[in-house]
């Protein structure tokens, strides 16, 4: 007996087109284009999950550097001073402090300066 793929193919196409929702034009409506775009989008998603970590670290460093320069230090000397002063705050917290509570950041910068002068 011959087995036809009608139901299976329809289900597979439907599942893939459902995943392609939100794509533009034929990349949403046509199975082959949708399949190609979906594969590409999964590659982008995989790559960018890793890149997001690098991007946030860069952003934090830029923010810390800007705040450190307001306190007469550059980023590398500021971080070195923190290490000498045994202040263990990560870059995410430091960047948040630089943005939302500059007075606290200034106190930490002063501690960093003091550790550098010793």
From Swiss-Prot:
One of its GO terms (biological process) is ribosomal large subunit assembly. It comes from the Bacteria. Pfam families: Ribosomal_L20. GO terms for cellular component: ribonucleoprotein complex; ribosome. Keywords: Ribonucleoprotein, Ribosomal protein, RNA-binding, rRNA-binding. GO terms for molecular function: rRNA binding; structural constituent of ribosome. HAMAP family: Ribosomal_bL20. Belongs to the bacterial ribosomal protein bL20 family. Binds directly to 23S ribosomal RNA and is necessary for the in vitro assembly process of the 50S ribosomal subunit. It is not involved in the protein synthesizing functions of that subunit. NCBIfam families: rplT_bact (TIGR01032). This is Large ribosomal subunit protein bL20. It comes from Sulfurovum sp. (strain NBC37-1).
